Regions:
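Extended, charge-biased low-complexity segments
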Residues: 1-127, 134, 145-188
C-alpha cells in the first residue's frame, strides 16, 4: 500500500488532525515533531472556511448539544470543566461575562503573581488526573493563553505528540467534547 496523499485544501493543523485520526502510523512519520499544544494553539489562525471541514474530520455533530445554547463555547467550556472534574483547576471568578469569567486557579490576577501554594496544588491535582483529563485541562489553558504556557503547565505532563493525544482522547471517549471546545472557541 502506498502513502496516503496529503489532503488538499486543508490548513496544516487540520491536515495533521485528519491524518492522525485516519492513519496514525503515517501521521507519526510525516509529522513526527508535531505536538498537541501546536494543534490547539493553531485554533486562532483557523478561519470559518478552514473550520468548515472540522466536523467531517472529527466525525462530529457540532449542532449537538452546545449549539443549542446562545453562547455555545461558554456552555461547552463549563460542561467540560464540570463533566471532567476540572473544578480544582478552574474557577468562575473572572471580571468578564460568560466564558471570560472562567480562569485557572493558582494565580492572583489582581496582583499579577503566582500564588506558590495554590499553584503547587494546581499542578498536583493536574498530575493526578488521567491523561485525557490532563489533555482537556491543557487545551483550556492553551486556548485561554492563546499560545503555549509556562505558568500553569510548567513541570507537568503536556508535551504529547498530536497522534498520541488524539488517540488518547478518542479512547477515553472525550474527543467529541475536546472537538467542540476547539471548534466553538471564539477567543478569550
Amino acid at each position: 500500500m502506498g502513502a496516503t496523499p496529503a489532503p488538499r485544501g486543508l490548513a496544516e493543523p487540520l491536515a495533521v488532525m485528519q491524518l492522525a485520526l485516519r492513519s496514525p502510523g503515517e501521521a507519526k512519520v510525516r509529522y513526527s515533531n508535531y505536538r498537541f499544544s501546536r494543534l490547539v494553539a493553531s485554533r486562532l489562525q483557523l478561519n470559518d472556511l478552514d473550520m468548515a471541514s472540522f466536523p467531517e474530520i472529527l466525525e462530529l455533530d457540532l449542532a449537538s448539544p452546545s449549539m443549542q445554547q446562545s453562547r455555545p463555547f461558554n456552555y461547552q467550556l463549563r460542561y467540560v470543566v464540570a463533566g471532567y472534574g476540572l473544578q480544582t483547576l478552574f474557577n468562575d471568578d473572572g471580571p468578564g461575562p460568560y466564558h471570560h469569567a472562567i480562569r485557572p486557579t493558582g494565580y492572583d490576577f489582581h496582583l499579577d503573581v503566582v500564588l506558590p501554594a495554590a499553584m503547587e496544588r494546581w499542578r498536583s491535582d493536574y498530575r493526578g488526573m488521567a491523561d485525557h483529563r490532563q489533555m482537556l485541562a491543557a487545551s483550556i489553558i492553551w486556548l485561554y493563553r492563546g499560545r503555549k504556557d509556562s505558568c500553569w503547565l510548567r513541570r507537568v505532563p503536556c508535551t504529547w505528540d498530536v497522534v498520541d493525544a488524539l488517540d488518547a482522547l478518542r479512547s477515553a471517549r472525550a474527543i467529541a467534547d475536546w472537538g467542540r471546545l476547539f471548534a466553538l472557541y471564539p477567543g478569550w
